[in-house]
Regions:
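Amphipathic, heptad-repeat alpha-helical coiled-coil "signal-transmission/dimerization" linkers
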Residues: 1-18, 22-36
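Histidine- and acidic-residue-rich, metal-dependent catalytic cores
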Residues: 23-261
Length: 261
C-alpha cells in the first residue's frame, strides 16, 4: 500500500511538472508572438488564428493519412510553435513591415530575411536548443515560405525536403494573410482566398495538404469569421498605444542574421 501511494505521488508530481512546463512554454511563446504582432500593425488575433488553423489542419492530416507518423504530442508542439513563425520580423525595419505600398525588390529581399533571423534567434538559445518545441519552431521560422515546387525561400527546398510542420504553417499563413486586412491591401473573402491558394497564385503547396485544407474549409470559414468580428471590436487607439509602448521598450533591438544563414 505504501509503495502504491508513493508511486501515485510520483506520478502526480511528474504530471504537475509536465503541465507547468507546457503552460510556461505557451506563455513565453504568446508573449514573443504578441510583440511581433503589434510591431507589425496586426490586431493581436493573428497568432490565435494561426494556432487554431494549424491545429485543425494537422488533425485532418492525421485522420487522412499516417504518412508522417504524427503523434498527439507532435501535433501539440507544432501548433504551439506555429505562433513563432514570424518572430524574425522583430529584426526587420518597421518602415518596411508597415509600408502601405508595394515593396521594392531591395525591400522584399530584406523582408525575406525574417525567416533566417527567426531561425537564428532560436538556434542561439543554447540552454533550450535541444527542446523539441524549439527545434520545431526553428523549422517553421526558417521554412514556412518554402514551396513544394522549390520556388520558395530562403533555401529553395522542394517537396518533402520541407519539414511537415513548415508545410502546414505555410498554407495557414498564406490563408491568414489573404483574409486579413493589411496597410497595403484589403482582406480577401474566404472564397477568393481559397481560389488563390488552390490555383497556385500564392505558390505550390503539397496536394495532400491542399485536400485536407479543402476538407475543413467550412470550419476554417467559421473561425475566420469569428476572428473578423473580434477585430472589429478592437479600437485603433488601443493598437496604436500598444505599438508605441513596444517601440519605446528595450524588447526590440537591431537583430542581424548570421552570415552563414
Amino acid at each position: 500500500i505504501k509503495l502504491y501511494a508513493k508511486q501515485r505521488r510520483l506520478i502526480t508530481l511528474v504530471t504537475d511538472q509536465v503541465y507547468e512546463k507546457e503552460k510556461n512554454n505557451r506563455i513565453m511563446v504568446s508573449i514573443l508572438s504578441k510583440i511581433v504582432e503589434f510591431r507589425n500593425g496586426e490586431s493581436g488575433l493573428h497568432v490565435e488564428h494561426i494556432n487554431k488553423l494549424s491545429g485543425m489542419l494537422l488533425e485532418r492530416l492525421v485522420q487522412k493519412t499516417d504518412k508522417y507518423h504524427l503523434t498527439w504530442t507532435d501535433q501539440y508542439l507544432i501548433t504551439v510553435a506555429s505562433a513563432l513563425h514570424d518572430i524574425g520580423k522583430i529584426g526587420i525595419d518597421e518602415k518596411i513591415l508597415n509600408k502601405p505600398g508595394k515593396l521594392t525588390p531591395e525591400e522584399f529581399e530584406l523582408m525575406k530575411m525574417h525567416t533566417m533571423i527567426g531561425a537564428s534567434m532560436l538556434e542561439r538559445m543554447e540552454i533550450y536548443k535541444e527542446e523539441r518545441l524549439v527545434q520545431i519552431a526553428c523549422e517553421i521560422c526558417r521554412w514556412h515560405h518554402e514551396r513544394y515546387d522549390g520556388s520558395g525561400y530562403p533555401d529553395g527546398l522542394k517537396g518533402e525536403e520541407i519539414p511537415i510542420a513548415a508545410q502546414v504553417v505555410s498554407i495557414v499563413d498564406v490563408y491568414d494573410a489573404l483574409t486579413s486586412p493589411r496597410v497595403y491591401k484589403k482582406a480577401y473573402s474566404h472564397e477568393k482566398a481559397m481560389e488563390m491558394i488552390l490555383t497556385g497564385e500564392c505558390g505550390v503547396f503539397q496536394p495532400l495538404l491542399l485536400d485536407c485544407f479543402c476538407d475543413i474549409q467550412e470550419e476554417v470559414r467559421k473561425v475566420t469569421q469569428e476572428k473578423s468580428e473580434k477585430e472589429g471590436k478592437i479600437s485603433g487607439f488601443e493598437l496604436t498605444d500598444l505599438k508605441e509602448t513596444l517601440k519605446n521598450s528595450h524588447l526590440i533591438g537591431d537583430l542581424k542574421p548570421e552570415k552563414n544563414h
